[in-house]
Amino acid sequence: GFGFEKKEYYEQMVRRNAKRMNQANNWIVFVRGNHDNPAYFEGTTFSYKRFIAVPDYTILQACNHSILCVGGAISIDRIYRINEWNKRKYRVHSNELQENDISRNLYWKNEAPAYDADKMNTICVDFLIDTVVTHTAPSHCELFSKSNLNQWAENDSLLLGDVQLEREVMDMLLHHLKINNHPVSHWYYGHFHQSWHSDIDGILYQMLDIMEFSQVY
């Protein structure tokens, strides 16, 4: 994730791959996951010719598609991540000049997706969305329960409610698109590290596994 390493690590990734991306005329757009520092996704911190980490509610227009991007999800192991970081943060940060918004970490408290009605209203004025890319998914999509969720919840009293709210945010996003007559036909997401797809009420929902690719026609 963006934030597990120093910023220089991600800059080196760009330098290593820039030539072949230019030759292939390809771009990589990163949508925020729960293991990413949101500070990288404000539009300028990680923005290069062929690589960009985009803010939530970004609209991509490519190949005759208008694509809405909204990141974020809940880490069910967040208590472990917080405790683990507390053990190692002094050693890590003692080797850095100073802490800042993009200092390394294992968990970010603002990881969850957020529903922004104002941004959606603005989008509706200028765009007709046909494709949605998110990290998590609406509540009617798999997975309905992540493995070991209840075990993690034993030591995290707010976890089950936060996970439910995460999916409700996606439901609100979908509802806003529907009532404003957006021609949504595809919805892509990840988060659950499995592969699944289903056509539900005219929308093809596709959960992508790690390193799984899907072509949008």
Positions of the model-derived regions?
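Generic beta-sheet signal
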Residues: V31-G33, V70, L208
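Short glycine-/acidic-enriched loop or helix-start segments at secondary-structure transitions
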Residues: E5-K7, A39-E42, I79, C141-F144, ...
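Proline-aspartate-enriched helix->loop->beta-strand connector
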Residues: L128-P138, H175-Y189
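Active-site-proximal loop/helix segment associated with metal-binding centers of metalloenzymes
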Residues: H65-E168
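Binuclear metal-dependent phosphoesterase catalytic core
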Residues: Q61-C63, D171-N180, F192-Y217
